[in-house]
């Protein structure tokens, strides 16, 4: 890099990448430059909100793969910006999208969905979330699920239940393919849940209103209110 008189760095990177990620290691004074061609977020908008609210899908790895979880009902589209329609993506055949001025995505039956978009190959998928449940020693054992019910008014998956002192996680469709626990290996981190190897959540014995809010990585949380 070029180092200025004030100690600042200037790095010139060839190419036409949309974004640049620079990682600096101050222990050994090295740096790494990564060219990134995808934004961190894209957005879904559709009939479920009267086409008025954009729902964020997050791409944590900047590889063009985005995911989010939302209540859906009817037709919808994807777009790169929350506040305008520039460059929005439409239906381009089953499971495919394109910026072609085409029609909306086919309507979905009302329900809560896992939405996946891959801009690298211009595909998408909407997977119905049939259930989200509590499982763990706090729930009796790791073989028994207690189902939550989605509440459209609060935007949360909810249940009032009695829990033992112990550990628990939340999982989708009674399966371990997708589950949520505490981010950063922290079992007390109720305010930031991850589906990427989340820690078992620690819970004290009691009866609680459990409210689980699932949107995307960095925006998932659970609120336990003692009853």
Segments and roles (model prediction):
Residues 1-227:
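Insoluble glucan recognition modules
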């Amino acid at each position: 890099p070029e180092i200025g008189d004030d100690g600042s760095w200037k790095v010139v990177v060839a190419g036409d990448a949309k974004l640049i990620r620079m990682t600096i290691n101050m222990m050994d004074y090295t740096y790494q430059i990564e060219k990134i061609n995808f934004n961190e977020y894209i957005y879904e908008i559709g009939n479920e909100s009267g086409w008025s609210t954009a729902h964020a899908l997050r791409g944590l790895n900047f590889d063009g793969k985005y995911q989010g979880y939302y209540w859906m009902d009817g037709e919808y589209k994807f777009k790169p910006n929350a506040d305008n329609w520039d460059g929005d993506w439409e239906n381009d055949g089953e499971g495919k999208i394109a910026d072609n001025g085409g029609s909306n995505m086919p309507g979905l039956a009302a329900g809560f969905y896992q939405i996946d978009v891959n801009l690298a190959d211009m595909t998408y998928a909407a997977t119905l979330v049939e259930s989200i449940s509590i499982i763990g020693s706090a729930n009796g054992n790791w073989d028994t699920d207690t189902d939550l019910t989605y509440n459209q008014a609060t935007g949360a998956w909810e249940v009032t239940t009695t829990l033992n002192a112990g550990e628990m996680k939340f999982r989708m469709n009674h399966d371990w393919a997708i589950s949520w626990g505490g981010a950063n290996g922290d079992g007390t981190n109720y305010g930031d849940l991850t589906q990427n190897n989340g820690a078992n959540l620690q819970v004290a014995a009691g009866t609680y209103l459990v409210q689980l809010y699932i949107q995307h990585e960095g925006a998932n949380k659970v609120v336990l209110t003692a009853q």
